[in-house]
């Protein structure tokens, strides 16, 4: 019997945090433009209020077994474990209902690597499944390596400086001390998550939001190591206009930027989940003030209990918002540098606009990205240890004023052109998207 002539349907299952939802929605928009219908399965906490950004998308709710508010209380590892243990039944019911509703037209379930419970439903209902990793290819490589380690032995081995500085085989300049384990809770539990993430089960492919011009060696490693196709499609945010934010963006900062000099502003944003201590905020404020450069600072809701001193400093030279339209900010000609936590989305967005970075990572994956920003791509400065006003001032001047910053900006602009070329017709990411579409269509015909 021939398949239904209507659009083939893709079901997307994002992990319920901003940094994971945004690229998943961008992927959905890219596939929608290629002729697929898109259904997005979200928990109650993530129901989309601005559906006008995604005309034609269907949104379905998976009843939450654990509220998103528990993420910070439990920590990311325990939240992921609990979410996966308790979500399978409600998700299967949701997909079974979709099959009845749409006449078995689901071509594939694409799920975030942290939502690995989705694979069991796909297998039971005989639907092809594909994994989407929203981090870097190098981070996925690290998960593969970590999944094979014994936690107790690794902790002992890593006390030896010689082991710490050993380069991971075929992955220069990645060293064992760079493997992203810090800030993730008990190591043994984290390694269990790594094992779940890299276990492809019956998934038929892996999609990564990256480009071969940024991570060629890591992508080559994955293509050799994994037994299924790997599709590097990034940066997805240049190929689509998807704009989904769980937090309300304050656009007044664009008006403020319009009044600033060319490449003079340092933009500061540390992501949607990172918290800062009051002392660190104060030292940052004084360092920024002493640099004599204007600054745009995102201090999100829940972290605004600042000393009065900070408000006075900011009123003279800066602008504070609770959340900014980041892509618009980074493309603005007044922005000369980006102080970032180095989440992968922010890293891609900054490089795509040719903006060099001050790197202040909080956890293991962010530290991995920061190492590549500073040492591999050489488009940023890494701030380590306690934040102190003198080091903040020096970092800003290195980036905005000194010749060193000029070199970083030139290298960032070269990468910008390479990344933009990769998503144009004939580019590596453009071709990878076409290959993925053909693959999904073939999988659909064979079901």
Curated annotation (Swiss-Prot):
InterPro entries to which the protein is assigned, alphabetical: UDP_glucos_trans
GO MF annotation list: UDP-glycosyltransferase activity
Alphabetical UniProt keywords: Glycosyltransferase, Transferase
Keyword Transferase among record annotations: yes
Pfam assignment, any one: UDPGT
Origin: domain of life: Eukaryota
Residues that, per the record, bind UDP-alpha-D-glucose: 272, 324-326, 341-349, 363-366
EC supergroup of this enzyme: transferase
EC number(s) reported in the record: 2.4.1.-
The keyword Nuclease belongs to this UniProt entry's keyword annotation: no
Similarity section: Belongs to the UDP-glycosyltransferase family.
Stated name of the protein: UDP-glycosyltransferase 76E5
């Amino acid at each position: 019997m021939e398949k239904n002539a209507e659009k083939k349907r893709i079901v997307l299952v994002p992990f319920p945090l901003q940094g994971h939802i945004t690229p998943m929605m961008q992927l959905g928009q890219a596939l929608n433009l290629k002729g697929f219908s898109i259904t997005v399965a979200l928990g109650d906490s993530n129901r989309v209020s601005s559906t006008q950004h995604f005309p034609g998308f269907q949104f379905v709710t998976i009843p939450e077994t654990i509220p998103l508010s528990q993420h910070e209380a439990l920590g990311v590892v325990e939240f992921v474990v609990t979410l996966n243990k308790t979500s399978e039944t409600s998700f299967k019911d949701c997909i079974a209902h979709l099959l009845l509703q749409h006449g078995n037209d689901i071509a594939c379930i694409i799920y975030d690597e942290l939502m690995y419970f989705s694979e069991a439903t796909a297998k039971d209902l005989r639907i092809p499944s594909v994994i989407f990793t929203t981090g870097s290819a190098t981070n996925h490589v690290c998960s593969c390596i970590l999944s094979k380690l014994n936690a107790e032995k690794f902790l002992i081995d890593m006390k030896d400086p010689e082991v710490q500085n050993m380069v991971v085989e075929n992955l220069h300049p990645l060293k064992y001390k760079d493997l992203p384990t810090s800030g993730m809770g008990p190591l043994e539990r984290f390694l269990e998550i790594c094992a779940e993430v890299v276990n492809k089960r019956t998934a038929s492919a892996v999609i990564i939001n990256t480009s071969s011009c940024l991570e060629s060696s890591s992508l080559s490693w994955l293509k050799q190591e994994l037994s299924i196709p790997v599709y590097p499609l990034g940066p997805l945010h240049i190929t689509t206009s998807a704009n989904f934010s769980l937090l309300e963006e304050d656009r007044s900062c664009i008006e403020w930027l319009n009044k600033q000099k060319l490449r003079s502003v340092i933009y500061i944003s540390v992501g949607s989940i990172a918290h800062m201590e009051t002392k660190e905020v104060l030292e940052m404020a004084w360092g920024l003030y002493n640099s004599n450069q204007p600054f745009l600072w995102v201090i999100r809701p829940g972290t605004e209990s600042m000393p009065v001193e900070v408000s006075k400093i900011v009123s003279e030279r800066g602008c504070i918002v609770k959340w900014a339209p980041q892509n618009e900010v980074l493309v603005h000609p007044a922005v000369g540098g980006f102080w970032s936590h180095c989440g992968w989305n922010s890293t891609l967005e900054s490089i795509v606009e040719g903006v060099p970075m001050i790197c202040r990572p909080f956890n293991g994956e962010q530290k991995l990205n920061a190492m590549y920003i500073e040492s591999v791509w050489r488009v940023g400065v890494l701030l380590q240890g306690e934040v102190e006003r003198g080091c903040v001032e020096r970092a800003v001047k290195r980036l905005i004023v000194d010749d060193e910053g000029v070199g970083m900006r030139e290298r960032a602009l070269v990468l910008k052109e390479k990344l933009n070329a990769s998503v144009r017709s004939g580019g590596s990411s453009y071709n990878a998207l076409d290959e993925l579409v053909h693959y999904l269509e073939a999988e659909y015909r064979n079901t």
